[in-house]
């Protein structure tokens, strides 16, 4: 007999004490167990049944009663139910009851069902599975529970409701289509509601199923008004009443009880076949008690399911009707908030149900997402996902999934957090609240597939510890041809995101027409589309992330053909069929030394340019010219990378018809008999009110150096040509030095000394207008191919040098910078010279004891290195060195480096052993020997030099034996290398522990470095090393040291680089020492000290470690006082944060 026959004998439940309920709880029987034991008798074809009476009770009220109910028509289901009338049923889950089960509908408050779970009345609904192994719902003992409907073994009996994990929750009691669903509790009209069990008479109970007609079938259990609903599970509001247990599809709810064949009574839970009914409910073992799902989870699920269902009126048929079209999208699996480590994979998933299928749109912070190579959007059936292989900070924010079809749209969202700290291995993963889509296949009895279970994702590999940026790969210095494409690529490593910045001379490089910068996670590339001269320089790649920074540098040299020779070629010494053509060198050699010059000629007959000859010097003797033609000349410069454009064209020139005279005779006349041209000597003061352009036309540039630039000037009033020397003078100290030099030159009016004729001061420039000397440096003139070097020429040069220096000394002045670069030839043909550059000259008259610490190592006297008082004899030592080189092409003291050179000078060791002196006269050797005396008192003075037998020789009649110039050429090549690649820097700028006091060196007018001597060069002589720690008395305003820019506190990450920068002012140049926690710092690979001549000082600490966390002090000291500035370096070490897992668990 159908169990519903018992409903006719339903009596009002009797209240039982709490103790009795605890005693009898093992005999509770779940009503679904009763259904499982029933056979499948056949029933006649259902007839139309009359509408149910208002008093028809809900069958679940029977299960909540405390007594057995007699069966109708003499049959009883007491044995099937196995219930004692005096026993009270327990709630699902063995939770203690605070009252008896309430009636399902229209019952009084005291008769409503108590919460299903293990909660007290005042508590909200606990998860279905928040208790120990659930007891059967009826009053039967566990061993006496009803058999399942299908002839299954006891092991296949119904498992306790909810005895699975959250992802394995029971399938809803009604997994059928909307037409067959249990109506929401209380969502039908009063006429259709089931009256509560307690308010009905026995005669109003349900008729047996077999006798019922189709019209008399039970209405869905839940078709009552809100007031008649099952009380909420817990203290939930009516809107939170018992919904279908799981995420059932709307089309899978229970069939109507009536009007069905016996075998079809109460369709199985879910989509199971008749023989497999209620399998989803029963297939979990008691030991699989699940962890509770939170209150909020159930709430969301309940509300989800309510929104997913659509109410339909009318009774159900035997077969399930098809789903209604136009179902609004619903999210059966919603997005969950996610927290991932930077660099980990980010995966967001949700499941959307809709008919027809919805169009899915993803947004991040309101911006629509599209599939890229980094972000992958996918939709497989109802499963939608967003996948990002490596999450970055910009991927954090609010993600929203919007589903849209013909019905109203639906959406769900979640927050994604990307953190950069490594996640703890023991940290609890965020709880997964989503569920996977259910299988479309029917479950198999006795297997775990009865309920679709979402498996936990495999544990992710812990992310690598965050690291500061590194540059594991970077190009070496490069030399490229002009016009070539240049690509500088730096590979980067470390924790992303890493910002890459290219800089040149501390200025950031921006994309332009010629330069492109491309950054990626792999590195950064700087591309120069076509290299040009202005692209030369040092390029720095700076990489930074949140943990620190790192930089690397590369020097780029763009080589090209040289610039054309400056100025206009000049024809001189014009004879009957020859002339001497001279010109200036190129203003820029193209990054490679000019190897030769190509001379081109044009005549008035052929009227075309042709190459005449190739020479290495800046002058050439043109022969075989015809007197009836006019000639023009131009010159090209040649280096290893090509030939320059031609220079300006010379003026038209015609050769004379007078007979050619011997060259030597003419030179003798021009040198010995020719009188010095009269010079307009002037006393010059600096003009600060007018500009140089007011009086002179500024033409082409003749040269440049560290001091500034030299331009060709043409005096507007007279048309005379002068040289304008433009000095850079930014500070007041620099502007004071130039007038001092002009003041000395005002006293030096002599034919062998260059003259200053005017001076102007303009903003950052001071301009000196000087007498022009166009013959070039003395030693450059000597190695010219058309110049024959003999001892006779050497005597002529040394005589002029001695005359000029003698005049300087008579004025009480010492030059202190005599060297080949400061001896200039007046023209390209004769032997007349002039001394230039009086920037380091000092007055000895009334100066007392004067000590200096500057000079060029190869030509400086021992007393300068020893920091002893100087005298006029200091210049005589330099004259002796110049004479030694002039006659032999060898340098007496030059070593492989500056230290060796200084050691040789201080020891005054030299000799004439080389074969170069085999052809030199004894008088010449004696002259040199009397100048290169270590004791300056034993040296010849200028007057004695001019009276020496060697300089007294008659140059007209003496034998002119030609000397080899090969050694001189080698010497000049070595000197050129030293000037460009190994120039000595100013004293006070090089030292590992401290900066040594002294004067800043500067280049002479010809570009040769004039540099003070560093302590490193003096380490070979212990007796003089202390001399360089003393202050130097100079004719400059003395200033106490101070910092115009101080160092600042730094905070860096272990493994990166730190840099302290400051700027130091003061004179004499301060001694600078760096300290780390009161300990002086010695320069090494770890600690690098950089100091330029402008006073900028830097301490660079590479590969910072924890030991570098300290206070750093820069101290500057000179004779007037001292100054310090201090900053702190904070080093952050990389440590994994503790307690992170606990924080995540709390969340």
Curated annotation (Swiss-Prot):
Family membership, please give it: Belongs to the protein kinase superfamily. CAMK Ser/Thr protein kinase family.
Q: Does the UniProt entry include the keyword Ion transport?
A: no
Originating organism: Oryctolagus cuniculus
Q: How is its activity regulated?
A: All catalytically active isoforms require binding to calcium and calmodulin for activation.
**Compositional bias per record (Polar residues), positions renumbered to this chain:** 644-653, 1002-1013
Q: Give the keywords, sorted.
A: Actin-binding, ATP-binding, Calcium, Calmodulin-binding, Cell projection, Cytoplasm, Cytoskeleton, Disulfide bond, Immunoglobulin domain, Kinase, Magnesium, Metal-binding, Nucleotide-binding, Phosphoprotein, Repeat, Serine/threonine-protein kinase, Transferase
Q: Where is this region: Disordered?
A: 1-330, 424-476, 644-678, 999-1019
Q: Which residues form the active site?
A: 817 (proton acceptor)
- Residue ranges for the region (16 X 12 AA tandem repeats) are 100-288
Instruction: Supply one GO BP term.
Output: tonic smooth muscle contraction
* Spans annotated as Actin-binding: 1-41
Q: Which residues form the Protein kinase domain?
A: 696-951
Q: Which reaction does it catalyse?
A: L-seryl-[myosin light chain] + ATP = O-phospho-L-seryl-[myosin light chain] + ADP + H(+); L-threonyl-[myosin light chain] + ATP = O-phospho-L-threonyl-[myosin light chain] + ADP + H(+)
In this UniProt entry, the residues modified to Phosphoserine are 670, 991-992, 1004-1005, 1008, 1011
Name any cofactors this protein relies on: Mg(2+); Ca(2+)
Q: In which tissues is it expressed?
A: Isoform Telokin is found in all smooth muscle tested except the aorta. It is not present in non-muscle tissue.
Renumbered to this chain, the Acidic residues biased-composition regions fall at 662-677
Record PTM Phosphothreonine, positions in chain: 1010
Q: Where is this region: Actin-binding (calcium/calmodulin-insensitive)?
A: 292-692
PTMs?
A: The C-terminus is deglutamylated by AGTPBP1/CCP1, AGBL1/CCP4 and AGBL4/CCP6, leading to the formation of Myosin light chain kinase, smooth muscle, deglutamylated form. The consequences of C-terminal deglutamylation are unknown. Can probably be down-regulated by phosphorylation. Tyrosine phosphorylation by ABL1 increases kinase activity, reverses MLCK-mediated inhibition of Arp2/3-mediated actin polymerization, and enhances CTTN-binding. Phosphorylation by SRC promotes CTTN binding.
Phosphotyrosine occurs at 681, 807, 867
- Protein name as annotated: Myosin light chain kinase, smooth muscle
sequence repeat boundaries on the chain: 100-111, 112-123, 124-132, 133-144, 145-156, 157-168, 169-180, 181-192, 193-204, 205-216, 217-228, 229-240, 241-252, 253-264, 265-276, 277-288
